[in-house]
Amino acid sequence: MILLVNGGAATSIHPNAARFYRIGTMSRQIHGAVSSSKHISLKTQHPLSDSNSELAYGASGSETRVYTRKKRLKQEPFEPLEKYSGKGVNTHKLCGLPDIEDFAYKKTIGSPSSSRSTETSITVTSVKTAGYPPENWVEVLEGIRQMRSSEDAPVDSMGCDKAGSFLPPTERRFAVLLGALLSSQTKDQVNNAAIHRLHQNGLLTPEAVDKADESTIKELIYPVGFYTRKATYMKKIARICLVKYDGDIPSSLDDLLSLPGIGPKMAHLILHIAWNDVQGICVDTHVHRICNRLGWVSRPGTKQKTTSPEETRVALQQWLPKEEWVAINPLLVGFGQMICTPIRPRCEACSVSKLCPAAFKETSSPSSKLKKSNRSKEP
């Protein structure tokens, strides 16, 4: 007795019937082999593994099952990636995000442009050029020197370096400190006159300032900018110098910056003049304005103008030779007082205007601009 399994149901048949069944099965296998020749090309393109072949030909309905498996094998999941990459797929990076180095300095040729890719390229360009001197800076600097030598500016005779120049070293350093404190938001002529009045009243030493009434100091330094606040600062600074520095002034940048009313510009200027210590460039409003007009400085990673004198100082120190750090301040301050003025600069009198990207862009007076706007409104 033989059990025949068909579609999950077991059936018993006679031995003779089983013999005829085996013969019929063999004939069907021969017929299936002939008919399967139609699929030779399909087998060549997508060969099955040995295990799949056994599954395909070991049961009824073999042709249908073979065709179904071959159709599934055609679906290759990585094929679409090759259409966009332009080269073979790097399989060990498929499951993770690309490294940052892949985007930092490389640009795919023929890739569609976008605003994000444009910003990245600008940033990379700015980073590459950071720390390198601007084009023609030597020629521009020499031209400014020649213009400055032909005409004196207020800073040449009334700058902070002239404060207390006739005093002993310790007293002179304190006078330089006071001159720097009073100089902010104040013209050199006004500042120099205030220092002269303090000297006439014996108030250029920390002992004298500490004992003086604050109201008296206010009257003597008026009309410097913020004279009320600066009188208060003078009293506090005098006390600090007496208590911490034995009547002298601080000799380090950090200690100077700890004094009330003293910022980076003043601290570097005081170190230059009082202690002959060069640790940075003194950048005031004139130096800040002129460096931006000349295109000498920009904000980190951009081509935009710097927004503060301190930001200008950091950018300028990245490329300006250190031997120029002291001279650049009075040079550009005088140039800003006489030619490259804050309002309506004299570009027509500037010998380096052809090298200045901002030349003749701020020379129009407000009245002329108003006239032009009125003309445009006329019918």
UniProtKB/Swiss-Prot annotation:
SUPFAM superfamilies reported for this sequence: DNA-glycosylase
* Keyword field contains Ribonucleoprotein: no
Q: Which Gene3D superfamilies does the record cross-reference, listed alphabetically?
A: Helix-hairpin-Helix base-excision DNA repair enzymes (C-terminal), Hypothetical protein, domain 2
A Pfam match is: HHH
Sorted UniProt keywords:
4Fe-4S, Chloroplast, DNA damage, DNA repair, Glycosidase, Hydrolase, Iron, Iron-sulfur, Lyase, Metal-binding, Plastid, Transit peptide
Q: Which residues form the active site?
A: 265 (nucleophile)
Which InterPro entries would you find in this protein's record?
DNA_glycosylase (IPR011257), Endonuclease-III-like_CS2 (IPR004036), Endonuclease3_FeS-loop_motif (IPR003651), Endouclease-III_FeS-bd_BS (IPR004035), HhH-GPD_domain (IPR003265), HhH_base_excis_C (IPR023170), HhH_motif (IPR000445), NTH1 (IPR030841)
Q: How is the cofactor bound?
A: Binds 1 [4Fe-4S] cluster. The cluster does not appear to play a role in catalysis, but is probably involved in the proper positioning of the enzyme along the DNA strand.
For this record, the Gene Ontology CC terms, alphabetical, are: chloroplast nucleoid; nucleus
Please identify the protein, giving its name as recorded.
Endonuclease III homolog 1, chloroplastic
Organism, by scientific name, is: Arabidopsis thaliana
